[in-house]
Amino acid sequence: MFTVIIPARFASTRLPGKPLADIHGKPMIVRVMERAKRSGAGRVIVATDNHDVVDAVVAAGGEACLTNENHHSGTERLAEVINKYQFSDDEIIVNVQGDEPLIPEEIIKQVAENLAGCKAGMATLAVQIHDAEEAFNPNAVKVVMDKQGYALYFSRATIPWERGRFIQSRETIGDNFLRHIGIYAYRAGFIRRYVQWEPSPLEQIEMLEQLRVLWYGEKIHVGIALKAPGVGVDTPEDLAAIRKVFTEI
């Protein structure tokens, strides 16, 4: 059994009030919560800094925790929740992003099961990259891993660098590229330790929070997602695209 916590910060720079954005008659955060509830989680909690988000979640039959508005990351918000609820150190927590209303419930369960079956402090997922444009896109985070399935590095750069191929052309790629999906599973005790660590230099260079874990010598298990998630919502254009998808479901 595992618990899903959905961080939902209200003051998005590019899309203010994003958690409450209407998607086919329901707030986005409720759409995400409904997916999480179908994952097999024993409990689903929305962690937010906004009273209106709390009210929307509760009105939809969900559970919400009002958190400090000054957190620097979603992981810090998770830490506040696990301490408020006094979760045991062994409890598996899955961090589902609050702006992914199309996240497949299958992969929420998958990442929790992957963590339960490995020795890493943290687990996440990836999907194969087939398109050269995506491989060279710094907004698509790439990951390389060892033969046991543990992350060696995450980067916005194109890794691994196909030296022989890219000398000739960058219009095609091989089968060596994986895009990281922003879903994480951890044990509650690991989150408590994580937030005590100082940010790492690599994390600050790449602006990738997960690099702190590797910097401090911990392992991250990377599984290949059973199903690729749909687009997340970062901009008004993303929101329009998501609304169109829901009208067709």
UniProtKB/Swiss-Prot annotation:
Q: Does the keyword Manganese apply?
A: no
Q: Where in the cell is it found?
A: Cytoplasm
Gene Ontology cellular component annotations, sorted alphabetically:
cytosol
Which top EC class is named for this enzyme in its record? transferase
A biological-process GO annotation: CMP-keto-3-deoxy-D-manno-octulosonic acid biosynthetic process
Pathway it works in: Nucleotide-sugar biosynthesis; CMP-3-deoxy-D-manno-octulosonate biosynthesis; CMP-3-deoxy-D-manno-octulosonate from 3-deoxy-D-manno-octulosonate and CTP: step 1/1; Bacterial outer membrane biogenesis; lipopolysaccharide biosynthesis
Secretion signal span: none
Q: Which UniProt keywords apply?
A: Cytoplasm, Lipopolysaccharide biosynthesis, Nucleotidyltransferase, Transferase
> What is the E.C. number?
2.7.7.38
The main place the protein resides is: cytoplasm
Q: Which InterPro entries match?
A: Cytidylyl_trans, KdsB, Nucleotide-diphossugar_trans
The terms under GO molecular function for this entry are: 3-deoxy-manno-octulosonate cytidylyltransferase activity
Q: Which residues form a coiled coil?
A: none
The family assignment reads:
Belongs to the KdsB family.
Please explain the role this protein plays, according to its UniProt record.
Activates KDO (a required 8-carbon sugar) for incorporation into bacterial lipopolysaccharide in Gram-negative bacteria.
Protein name, UniProt field: 3-deoxy-manno-octulosonate cytidylyltransferase
- Tell me what organism the protein belongs to: Photorhabdus laumondii subsp. laumondii (strain DSM 15139 / CIP 105565 / TT01) (Photorhabdus luminescens subsp. laumondii)
